């Protein structure tokens, strides 16, 4: 079985491409079914395995398959599914086989491949991806083992290194950028669009600055209300956004919408109503919530996840010692996993050997039972049974020795000696 990871992330592709390759949660299960059946092949009983990890910074396909051409098929499927020409997508895609795929999974879960070094959100997202793949019936022995080892490695890395300490989060970076635009965040009105984990983190950081007003707009009014109350703010219907956008100096958006929810026209009207006082906007969603053309407006300061990445990276350099520790742990665990994978490769052969030997045994026992039933001498029947089993069990190795010659034969002879050197002796004449 071959392990393979195909993907794009914030290292290889801009947000404009990442948002086109992202999978909304409700699409992942049906996508897994087509990915397995159409491009990896129905190789029963060795059914291919697959999982999809899709976040704002990455879209990755984890596969286990016997098809050595799965790499090209996976890239082609990703292209066709999202209707992106292969020539446009392929230069941004990485394909990681075997140990590289294992190492990548360990690094991703440990926060080493994140824009925010050591961040923990990705681990939860990976667990969600595994849960979804399990519900879709897409996981099997190999990916199950890979992900269980992945979660164990992430726990070890976070528990024995300082990889996650003093990290500059995306939420903290958003506050830092706002402080570059406004002298005091405390004097500003802040609007959060969405009520997920990222918005909750941003609200925590902005609330610490004591803004003049804090408002949450969300499709689900009850959830938005609960989040607003936590930070002493208030909620408003998302439908009020076009008519009330001008009230806010800072707007942070992160929803699961597949289409922009803030268009150029709405922002132009808001800027005009504000008499060209600046608006600071942060779009943390992928796909983006705010049309990119908004960033061209003179009085709008629009930042995406990629823009915030530059600030985040400033805080990453100081933790390189922890990175080295984490990489060493991961390398050891990769080797351990590959050893397990190697042992799995012989399981089908061993199973086949057992099946063949058992078939021979049953056939000879059946013959012996018939001979005993007709009254043949039991001792003679047992002798014939043992002789027949011996001859048939060594027929394969004997034939193999007779078929080869030269160096191949010498190697096979050494191998056979190793097989039989510990054979028990029923009549030891050594005198010991």
UniProtKB/Swiss-Prot annotation:
<comment type="similarity">
    <text>Belongs to the glutamyl-tRNA reductase family.</text>
</comment>
<dbReference type="Pfam" id="PF05201">
    <property type="entry name" value="GlutR_N"/>
</dbReference>
<keyword id="KW-0521">NADP</keyword>
<keyword id="KW-0560">Oxidoreductase</keyword>
<feature type="binding site">
    <location>
        <begin position="119"/>
        <end position="121"/>
    </location>
    <ligand>
        <name>substrate</name>
    </ligand>
</feature>
<dbReference type="GO" id="GO:0008883">
    <property type="term" value="F:glutamyl-tRNA reductase activity"/>
</dbReference>
<feature type="binding site">
    <location>
        <position position="125"/>
    </location>
    <ligand>
        <name>substrate</name>
    </ligand>
</feature>
<dbReference type="InterPro" id="IPR015896">
    <property type="entry name" value="4pyrrol_synth_GluRdtase_dimer"/>
</dbReference>
<feature type="site" description="Important for activity">
    <location>
        <position position="104"/>
    </location>
</feature>
<dbReference type="Pfam" id="PF01488">
    <property type="entry name" value="Shikimate_DH"/>
</dbReference>
<dbReference type="InterPro" id="IPR036343">
    <property type="entry name" value="GluRdtase_N_sf"/>
</dbReference>
<feature type="active site" description="Nucleophile">
    <location>
        <position position="56"/>
    </location>
</feature>
<protein>
    <recommendedName>
        <fullName>Glutamyl-tRNA reductase</fullName>
        <ecNumber>1.2.1.70</ecNumber>
    </recommendedName>
</protein>
<dbReference type="InterPro" id="IPR018214">
    <property type="entry name" value="GluRdtase_CS"/>
</dbReference>
<dbReference type="InterPro" id="IPR006151">
    <property type="entry name" value="Shikm_DH/Glu-tRNA_Rdtase"/>
</dbReference>
<feature type="binding site">
    <location>
        <begin position="55"/>
        <end position="58"/>
    </location>
    <ligand>
        <name>substrate</name>
    </ligand>
</feature>
<dbReference type="InterPro" id="IPR015895">
    <property type="entry name" value="4pyrrol_synth_GluRdtase_N"/>
</dbReference>
<feature type="binding site">
    <location>
        <begin position="194"/>
        <end position="199"/>
    </location>
    <ligand>
        <name>NADP(+)</name>
    </ligand>
</feature>
<dbReference type="GO" id="GO:0050661">
    <property type="term" value="F:NADP binding"/>
</dbReference>
<comment type="function">
    <text>Catalyzes the NADPH-dependent reduction of glutamyl-tRNA(Glu) to glutamate 1-semialdehyde (GSA).</text>
</comment>
<comment type="pathway">
    <text>Porphyrin-containing compound metabolism; protoporphyrin-IX biosynthesis; 5-aminolevulinate from L-glutamyl-tRNA(Glu): step 1/2.</text>
</comment>
<keyword id="KW-0627">Porphyrin biosynthesis</keyword>
<dbReference type="InterPro" id="IPR036453">
    <property type="entry name" value="GluRdtase_dimer_dom_sf"/>
</dbReference>
<dbReference type="GO" id="GO:0019353">
    <property type="term" value="P:protoporphyrinogen IX biosynthetic process from glutamate"/>
</dbReference>
<dbReference type="InterPro" id="IPR000343">
    <property type="entry name" value="4pyrrol_synth_GluRdtase"/>
</dbReference>
<feature type="binding site">
    <location>
        <position position="114"/>
    </location>
    <ligand>
        <name>substrate</name>
    </ligand>
</feature>
<dbReference type="Pfam" id="PF00745">
    <property type="entry name" value="GlutR_dimer"/>
</dbReference>
<dbReference type="InterPro" id="IPR036291">
    <property type="entry name" value="NAD(P)-bd_dom_sf"/>
</dbReference>
<comment type="subunit">
    <text>Homodimer.</text>
</comment>
């Amino acid at each position: 079985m071959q392990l393979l990871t195909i993907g794009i992330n914030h290292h290889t592709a801009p947000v404009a491409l990442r948002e086109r390759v992202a999978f909304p949660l409700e699409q992942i299960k049906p996508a897994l079914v087509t990915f397995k059946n159409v491009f990896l092949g129905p190789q029963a009983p060795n059914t291919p395995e697959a999982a999809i990890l899709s976040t704002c910074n990455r879209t990755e396909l984890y596969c286990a398959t016997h098809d050595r051409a799965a790499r090209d098929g996976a890239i082609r499927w990703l292209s066709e599914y999202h209707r992106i020409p292969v020539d446009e997508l392929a230069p941004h895609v990485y394909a990681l086989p075997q140990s590289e795929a294992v190492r990548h999974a360990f690094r991703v879960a440990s926060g080493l491949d994140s824009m925010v070094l050591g961040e923990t959100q990705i681990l939860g997202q990976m667990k969600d991806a595994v849960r979804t793949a399990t519900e879709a019936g897409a996981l099997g022995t190999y990916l199950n083992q890979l992900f269980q080892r992945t979660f164990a490695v992430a726990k070890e890395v976070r528990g024995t290194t300082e990889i996650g300490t003093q990290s500059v989060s995306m939420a903290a970076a958003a506050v830092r950028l706002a402080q570059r635009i406004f002298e005091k965040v405390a004097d500003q009105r802040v609007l959060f669009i969405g009520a997920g984990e990222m918005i909750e983190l941003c609200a925590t950081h902005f609330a610490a600055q004591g803004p003049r007003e804090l408002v949450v707009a969300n499709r689900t009014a009850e959830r938005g209300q609960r989040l607003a109350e936590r930070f002493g703010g208030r909620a408003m219907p998302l439908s009020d956004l076009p008519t009330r956008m001008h009230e806010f100096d800072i707007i942070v958006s992160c929803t699961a919408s597949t289409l922009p929810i803030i268009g150029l026209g709405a922002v132009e009207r808001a800027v005009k109503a504000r008499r060209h006082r600046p608006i600071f906007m942060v779009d943390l969603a992928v796909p983006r919530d705010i049309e990119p053309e908004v960033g061209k407006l003179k009085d709008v300061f629009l930042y995406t996840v990629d823009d915030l990445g530059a600030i985040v990276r400033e805080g990453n350099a100081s933790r390189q010692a922890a990175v080295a520790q984490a990489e060493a742990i991961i390398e050891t665990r990769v080797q351990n996993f590959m050893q397990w994978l190697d042992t799995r490769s012989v399981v089908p052969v061993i199973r086949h050997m057992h099946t063949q030997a058992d078939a021979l045994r049953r056939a000879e026992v059946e013959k012996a039972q018939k001979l005993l039933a007709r009254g043949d001498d039991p001792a003679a029947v047992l002798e014939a049974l043992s002789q027949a089993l011996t001859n048939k069990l060594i027929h394969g190795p004997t034939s193999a020795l007779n078929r080869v010659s030269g160096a191949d034969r010498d190697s096979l002879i050494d191998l056979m000696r190793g097989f039989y050197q510990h054979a028990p002796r029923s009549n030891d004449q050594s005198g010991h």
